[in-house]
């Protein structure tokens, strides 16, 4: 029998938002377990930082300074490596637990920590490899950029101008605004291209520690290469997942920073800024809050990375592309049932329409909503920037024709119009799209989610306006809305609660993706009903075959070959076919099975 799937919904690749949703869902389900690992992990770092000062004080108090320094440096180096190694190992243990659960190979926290702790030094090797790679990359890019700019500057006569008149270049730019603008745009383009390229490269190495922390046969150097392989064709998917997960953890950082600031103001205000004892308490409190922040955010981040690693393996290697059984129905024991987890990775809601029809939807979740909000806010910011830019140009021209005694009144009008326009753009954007596009803004469309009423009907103008008016409260540091979405049973923010709306996921229909079918497969499909028993295939079996055919071009070459041969062997056994006809590849056989099943096996 093939391994059963504890989460059948993971057969298809996850969207960036759902990757985050699944990670948070698993974190909440295993809060005690993952947080316990985070606490023990942070203790290694906190202990190192706390004990460093008294240890150094004792050494310098007992020994001569030169000898103390010679002893402290190697000792501190070894302790730092060991403690940070345990920190990295503990972080990887959380991702390992997530990956194992999604794979159906459940493991205890004790076993996961034992595995990663035994490899603690290897995580440092991975870090050193990355440091060397990125250092070489930075130096190479810097030198190449310097050479290119020097050649351009020289070809334009810049060096000669500097020798004759050091300020001549600046004077030339002042006399020629077009040249200055072109230079500015060129520099801006270089910065944008460099940022995009750097982000892409960073994404390719974003999961370097996970193969080493999860796969027993993987060495540190191999782990770096495996990250590069798995993120091929998925770099921007990885960027979106990591960016959204960072956005979700902003509220935690903001709240802790607010608490730290309030505590500092209170203590300093009561005792004065010159009181060294109070300052020590403030620093210790800030340190404790910082460690608390790591305890909260570390398991969230590592849970999401564990889901991301699983999803990348599924995308590139087809982890879930296995038939749930290897034998025909008449040979499978009657007491064998698919193993499903009792945990729902994606929360569902059942609505009753005015026509008394029950509809089931998957809620959008905080991951998809954060991704949509990010895109929408970028578009709103772009619109506001254009409004202020052209508004400023218009105001500047208008002021030149006004008399000086009207300047004060004009400025007040300009400010009022600016704020009114900003409000209309920021609120009207959401009202307009949600009303006219059936609850979808461009961001929601990208994230494949939409807003509906509590009874399943499309949102109207009233609901869209209420949601838009309350959005500033929900979006303040992403705190209010995020907290409500996480803890409300229907994942509603304040605007949803008042407007009576829900944010749901659109159904992702995998059948819409085209499948290239060969002539040989179509010919074999017509023969299969007489050569085999296609009725032995179950819908779940067909779904796996279809998923492979749709995704085979995105798999690695080795994974595609292995999966194709394995699925062909399993399917051949299921349909009682003795051998695959000569000259037919495993891919062509699966294509024929796909066609024959769709035709009803006749």
Where does each model-flagged region fall?
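Polar-ligand-bearing catalytic/cofactor-coordination segments
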Residues: 126, 231, 314
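Membrane-water interface at loop-to-transmembrane-helix junctions
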Residues: 228-238
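Short, highly charged, low-complexity non-transmembrane loops/tails of multi-pass membrane proteins
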Residues: 309-336, 499-504
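Ligand/cofactor pocket segment of small-molecule handling proteins
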Residues: 466-500
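Canonical alpha-helical transmembrane segment with a positive-inside/aromatic-interface signature
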Residues: 487-522
């Amino acid at each position: 029998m093939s391994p059963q799937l504890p989460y059948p919904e993971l057969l298809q690749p996850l969207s960036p938002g759902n990757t985050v949703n699944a990670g948070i869902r698993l974190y909440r389900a295993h809060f005690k377990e993952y947080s316990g690992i985070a606490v023990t992990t942070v203790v290694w770092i906190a202990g190192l930082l706390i004990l460093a000062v008294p240890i150094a004080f004792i050494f310098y108090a007992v020994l001569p300074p030169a000898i103390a320094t010679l002893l402290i440096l190697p000792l501190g180096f070894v302790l730092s490596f060991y403690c940070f190694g345990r920190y990295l190992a503990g972080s990887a243990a959380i991702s390992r637990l997530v990956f194992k659960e999604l794979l159906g190979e459940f493991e205890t926290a004790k076993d996961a920590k034992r595995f990663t702790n035994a490899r603690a030094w290897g995580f440092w090797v991975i870090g050193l490899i990355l440091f060397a790679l990125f250092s070489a990359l930075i130096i190479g890019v810097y030198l190449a950029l310097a050479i290119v700019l020097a050649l351009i500057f020289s070809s334009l006569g810049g060096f000669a101008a500097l020798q004759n008149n050091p300020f001549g270049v600046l004077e030339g730019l002042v006399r020629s605004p077009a040249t200055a603008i072109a230079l500015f745009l060129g520099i801006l383009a270089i910065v944008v291209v460099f940022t995009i390229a750097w982000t892409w490269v960073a994404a390719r190495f974003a999961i370097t520690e996970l193969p080493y922390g999860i796969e027993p046969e993987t060495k540190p150097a191999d782990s770096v290469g495996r990250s590069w392989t798995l993120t091929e064709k998925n770099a921007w998917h990885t960027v979106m997942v990591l960016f959204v997960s960072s956005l979700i953890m902003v509220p935690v950082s903001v709240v802790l920073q607010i608490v730290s600031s309030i505590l500092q103001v209170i203590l300093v205000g009561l005792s004065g800024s010159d009181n060294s004892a109070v300052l020590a308490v403030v620093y210790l409190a800030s340190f404790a809050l910082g460690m608390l922040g790591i305890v909260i955010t570390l398991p969230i981040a590592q849970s999401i990375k564990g889901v991301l690693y699983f999803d990348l393996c599924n995308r590139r290697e087809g982890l879930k592309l296995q038939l749930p059984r290897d034998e025909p129905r008449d040979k499978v024991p009657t007491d064998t049932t698919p193993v499903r987890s009792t945990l729902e990775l994606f929360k569902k809601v059942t609505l009753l329409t005015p026509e008394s029809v029950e509809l089931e939807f998957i809620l959008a979740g905080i991951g998809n909503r954060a991704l949509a909000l990010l895109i929408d806010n970028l578009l709103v910011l772009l619109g506001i920037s254009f409004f202020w830019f052209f508004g400023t140009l218009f105001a500047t021209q208008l002021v030149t024709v006004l008399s000086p005694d009207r300047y004060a009144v004009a400025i007040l009008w300009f400010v009022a119009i600016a704020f009114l326009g900003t409000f209309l753009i920021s609120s009207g954007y959401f009202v307009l799209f949600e009303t006219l596009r059936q609850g979808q803004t461009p961001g929601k469309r990208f994230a494949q989610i939409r807003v509906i009423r509590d009874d399943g009907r499309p949102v109207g103008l009233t609901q869209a306006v209420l949601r838009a008016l309350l959005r500033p409260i929900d979006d303040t540091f992403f705190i209010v809305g995020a907290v409500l979405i996480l803890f409300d049973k229907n994942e509603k923010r304040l605007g949803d609660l008042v407007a009576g709306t829900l944010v749901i996921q659109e159904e992702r229909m995998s059948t819409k993706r085209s499948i290239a079918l060969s002539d040989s497969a179509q010919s074999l499909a017509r023969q299969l009903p007489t050569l085999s028993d296609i009725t032995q295939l179950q819908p779940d079996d067909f779904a796996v075959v279809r998923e492979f055919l749709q995704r085979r071009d995105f798999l690695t070459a080795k994974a595609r070959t292995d999966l194709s041969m394995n699925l062909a062997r399993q399917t051949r056994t299921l349909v009682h076919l003795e051998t695959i006809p000569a000259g037919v590849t495993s891919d062509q056989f699966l294509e024929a099975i796909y066609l024959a099943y769709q035709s009803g096996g006749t």
